[in-house]
C-alpha cells in the first residue's frame, strides 16, 4: 500500500525514510514527495564511437562507455543545462534518499515537463528497498525546442510503497549493487552485470 502525505511525514519524522536535505512540508502532497534537480550532469559525446556492443565482454563494454560518456558536468547554481531535441543526458537529484528494507519508492516525472517533451526517467523509476543515495535521472528531450534546466528546480516526485515484509536481499546488502551510495550522475555500469 502506498503511503499518504501524513504517513510520509511521520516516516520522515521517525527516520524510517531518510531524505537529505530534509524536505519542506510544501514538498509533500497527496501520496508523493517532490524532488529537485541537482547540479551534476553527464552526456553522451557525439561521434565518439560508431556503436556500443552491450553484449560484448565486460572490458569492451566498459571501454566503450568510457569513450562515449562525458566527464561530469557540474553547474554553478545560476547556470542552466540545455538539453536539445533528441538529446539524452544523465543528471542527479538534489536530494539523497534512504529507504528501509520493507519499502520501495516510485519516481515519476512531472506532467508539466512531459508536456514540453522532457522525459525525466527513460525506464528506471523503481527505487529499491534498502536504497541509499542520490537518484540518477535519465533525461530525453522528445520535444521540438531546447529546454533549459537549472539546479533546484522541481523535477519529479517519489511515492513510497510499504511491502508485506522486509526483503531478504535489500539493495544496500547486495554484493552486486552497482550503484550503492551513488552521489553523482554515475554512468552506466552494465559491464558489471553478472552472467
From Swiss-Prot:
It catalyses: dCTP + H2O + H(+) = dUTP + NH4(+). This is dCTP deaminase. It comes from Idiomarina loihiensis (strain ATCC BAA-735 / DSM 15497 / L2-TR). Catalyzes the deamination of dCTP to dUTP. Its EC number is 3.5.4.13. Keywords: Hydrolase, Nucleotide metabolism, Nucleotide-binding. GO terms for biological process: dUMP biosynthetic process; dUTP biosynthetic process; nucleobase-containing small molecule interconversion. Homotrimer. It comes from the Bacteria. Belongs to the dCTP deaminase family. Pathway: Pyrimidine metabolism; dUMP biosynthesis; dUMP from dCTP (dUTP route): step 1/2.
Amino acid at each position: 500500500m502506498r503511503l499518504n502525505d501524513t504517513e510520509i511525514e511521520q516516516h520522515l519524522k521517525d527516520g524510517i525514510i531518510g531524505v537529505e536535505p530534509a524536505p519542506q512540508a510544501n514538498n509533500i502532497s497527496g501520496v508523493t514527495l517532490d524532488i529537485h534537480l541537482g547540479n551534476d550532469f553527464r552526456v553522451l559525446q557525439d561521434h565518439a564511437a560508431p556503436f556500443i556492443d552491450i553484449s560484448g565482454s565486460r572490458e569492451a563494454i566498459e571501454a566503450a562507455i568510457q569513450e562515449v560518456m562525458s566527464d561530469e558536468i557540474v553547474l554553478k547554481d545560476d547556470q542552466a543545462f540545455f538539453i536539445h531535441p533528441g538529446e539524452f543526458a544523465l543528471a542527479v537529484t538534489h536530494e539523497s534518499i534512504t529507504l528501509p528494507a520493507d519499502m520501495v519508492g516510485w519516481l515519476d516525472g512531472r506532467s508539466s515537463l512531459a508536456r514540453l517533451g522532457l522525459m525525466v526517467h527513460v525506464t528506471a523509476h523503481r527505487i529499491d528497498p534498502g536504497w541509499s543515495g542520490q537518484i540518477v535521472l535519465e533525461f530525453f528531450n522528445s520535444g521540438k525546442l531546447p529546454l533549459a534546466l537549472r539546479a533546484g528546480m522541481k523535477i519529479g516526485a517519489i511515492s513510497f510503497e510499504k511491502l508485506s515484509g522486509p526483503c531478504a536481499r535489500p539493495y544496500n546488502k547486495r554484493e552486486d549493487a552497482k550503484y550503492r551510495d551513488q552521489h553523482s550522475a554515475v554512468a552506466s555500469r552494465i559491464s558489471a552485470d553478472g552472467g
